[in-house]
Amino acid sequence: MELQFLGTGAGQPAKQRNVSSLALKLLDEINEVWMFDCGEGTQRQILETTIKPRKIRKIFITHLHGDHIFGLPGFLSSRSFQASEEQTDLDIYGPIGIKTYVLTSLKVSGARVPYQIHFHEFDDKSLGKIMETDKFEVYAERLAHTIFCMGYRVVQKDLEGTLDAEALKAAGVPFGPLFGKIKNGQDVELEDGRLICAKDYISAPKKGKIITIIGDTRKTSASVKLAKDADVLVHESTYGKGDERIARNHGHSTNMQAAQIAHEAGAKRLLLNHVSARFLGRDCRQMEKDAATIFENVKMVQDLEEVII
C-alpha cells in the first residue's frame, strides 16, 4: 500500500508543485489505484509515474474548486484511449454537482467514453460510511471550507491470520484438505487420534491500515474524527506559522493547525500537502520544523513523492 502525490500545490500550478491530486496504490491488496482529486495537469503527472490509467478504478473528489477538478474531464477522456480489452468501469465519489460537471464537460467537448462511469454524490445528509467492499470501508465528513468540502477516511479491514504451514508439517499433519480446514479455523482430528487446534497454528489477525485525506478546510473537529488513530494523515497546509487569520478567512489551515489535528487524533504520521506557491524550498523545510514542535512525525511532501504505508 502506497501513496503517491501527483500534485501538492494550492490554487494554481507552480514550477515546483502541480495542483491537488494524489493516488492511493492498492495494487497488492486489490489490484487497484484510487485517486483523490484531479486538478489541472494530473494526467501529465501520471505519465511521470508507473500508474496505469486503467488501474484507477475509483476517484474521490473533496470539493468542486477548480484546482481539485479541472483535470478530471481530460483524464477521463484520455483513459478511453486504452485498448478495448483494457477498458474498466470507474466510480466517482464527490459533492453534489460533480456528475453535472463531468457529463457537461464531456458532452460539450464531444468526448466519447467507452467505459461506464458510476457517480456517487453526497451532501450533509448522506455522509458517514459512503462505500464498503470485502476489504475496505470509506467514510466521509464535511469539513469547514468556503464551499461544501469532504474529508475521507479509508479503513482497511483487519487481515486474517496466516497459517503456520511449517508447524503443521512438524506436527505430522499431511498437506491437503486438512490444511484448508485448519486455515478456516476448524479443529481437526488426525488418524492417530490427536486433536489439532486451529488457533494454535494461525497467527492473530493483523490490524488493517487507516489513511485519512483531509481536503481544504479550516481547523475543525471533523478532521480529528476522520483522523482518529490513522496510520497516515494527509492534511492541507496552505499557510504557515502565524498565518492563522488569513488561513481562516480563506477556509484553509496552517502547518501548525495540521499538526494539532494529528496530535489530537492520535495519528501515527502526518504528511503536509496543498502548499501555497509563495512557500519555496527553505520555507517548506521551516514549516516542517515548526509543525514538528507539536507533532514530531511530520513531513512536507513533494510532487511525485511516494510514501509506503
From Swiss-Prot:
Function summary: Zinc phosphodiesterase, which displays some tRNA 3'-processing endonuclease activity. Probably involved in tRNA maturation, by removing a 3'-trailer from precursor tRNA.
The keyword Protease is assigned to this record: no
Amino-acid positions noted as binding Zn(2+) 1 in the UniProt annotation, renumbered to this chain: 63, 65, 145, 216
Gene Ontology molecular-function annotations: 3'-tRNA processing endoribonuclease activity; zinc ion binding
NAD listed as a keyword: no
Family: Belongs to the RNase Z family.
Active-site annotation: 67
Enzyme class, spelled out: hydrolase
Gene, per the UniProt record: rnz
Name listed for the protein in its UniProt record: Ribonuclease Z
Annotated keywords: Endonuclease, Hydrolase, Metal-binding, Nuclease, tRNA processing, Zinc
PANTHER family: ZINC PHOSPHODIESTERASE ELAC PROTEIN 1 (PTHR46018:SF2)
Catalytic reactions of this protein: Endonucleolytic cleavage of RNA, removing extra 3' nucleotides from tRNA precursor, generating 3' termini of tRNAs. A 3'-hydroxy group is left at the tRNA terminus and a 5'-phosphoryl group is left at the trailer molecule
Binding locations of Zn(2+) 2: 67-68, 216, 274
Pfam family, one: Lactamase_B
Cofactor: Zn(2+)
Signal peptide, first to last residue: none
Subunit and partners: Homodimer.
The EC number(s) this enzyme carries: 3.1.26.11
Source organism, top-level taxon: Bacteria
UniProt cofactor note: Binds 2 Zn(2+) ions.
Source organism: Streptococcus pyogenes serotype M1
